UniProtKB/Swiss-Prot annotation:
This is Ribonuclease 3. Its main location: cytoplasm. PROSITE patterns: DS_RBD (PS50137), RNASE_3_1 (PS00517), RNASE_3_2 (PS50142). The gene is rnc. Digests double-stranded RNA. Involved in the processing of primary rRNA transcript to yield the immediate precursors to the large and small rRNAs (23S and 16S). Processes some mRNAs, and tRNAs when they are encoded in the rRNA operon. Processes pre-crRNA and tracrRNA of type II CRISPR loci if present in the organism. It comes from Listeria welshimeri serovar 6b (strain ATCC 35897 / DSM 20650 / CCUG 15529 / CIP 8149 / NCTC 11857 / SLCC 5334 / V8).
Length: 229
């Protein structure tokens, strides 16, 4: 099994055009050093992948959070598709080992350079879209990105506690309290449960990997309750 067969097995998709897959992992420095091979770099695929990623993530957020304001969805999407997040996704599936670099870029540490890794993730999305279609891109993101959204990893970019405070205090002063109800799971993978109480009435409960995430989740539930009355 060569490295490209290994990569396809790793991501769970077969490419009809393996050259397109190779291009997604080809840095311009490699092209400059292999001009006789007529290879193409990944910059155009990165351009396309960036747009496909924004569309698919936007669609997921739009459907998952039907009551979230546009501004908050924008902030959340920005946190998901920012360079540090893309690097995390690329590292999780060991993309760096497949990147084709020029010797100079390799010596300069390009294989672990964050911007380069983020670009490769986007160019792979572009190649996957061209070769397999948008549905397969969504299937891939359902394994790599969407579970992190579901787990609340990006909720800190959306301050539901502030939103809730603004909603309930529009007409009167109220007392908002948050209680941590308990925790479950082993030390390395804890989950916390929280509730939000407004003027003595429990309005929402939620859970999260941290106490802050649990409180944010409870506030989000309370907002949903209030806006659907």
């Amino acid at each position: 099994m060569n490295q490209w067969e290994e990569l396809q097995e790793s991501v769970g998709f077969d490419f009809q055009d393996v050259e397109l897959l190779k291009q997604a992992f080809t840095h311009s420095s490699y092209v400059n050093e292999h001009r006789r091979e007529n290879v193409k770099d990944n910059e155009r695929l990165e351009f396309l992948g960036d747009a496909v990623l924004e569309l698919t993530v936007s669609n997921y957020l739009f459907n998952k959070y039907p009551d979230m304001a546009e501004g908050h969805m924008t902030k959340m999407r920005a946190a998901i598709v920012c360079e540090p997040s893309l690097v995390e996704f690329a590292e999780a599936i060991h993309f760096s080992k497949y990147i084709r670099l020029g010797k100079g870029e390799e010596k300069a540490g390009g294989r672990t350079r964050p911007a380069l890794l983020a670009d490769v993730f986007e160019s792979f999305i572009g190649a996957l879209y061209l070769d397999n279609g948008i549905d397969k891109v969504v299937t891939f993101l359902e394994r790599v990105i969407f579970p992190k959204i579901d787990a609340g990893e990006y909720l800190q970019t959306v301050d539901y506690k502030t939103q809730l405070q603004e909603i309930v205090q529009r007409d009167r002063d109220v007392l908002i309290e948050y209680d941590i109800l308990g925790e479950t799971g082993p030390a390395h993978n804890k989950a916390f449960d929280a509730q939000v109480i407004v003027n003595g009435q429990v309005l929402g409960k939620g859970s999260g990997r941290t106490k802050k995430q649990a409180e944010q989740s409870a506030a989000q539930f309370a907002i949903n309750q209030l806006t659907h009355r």
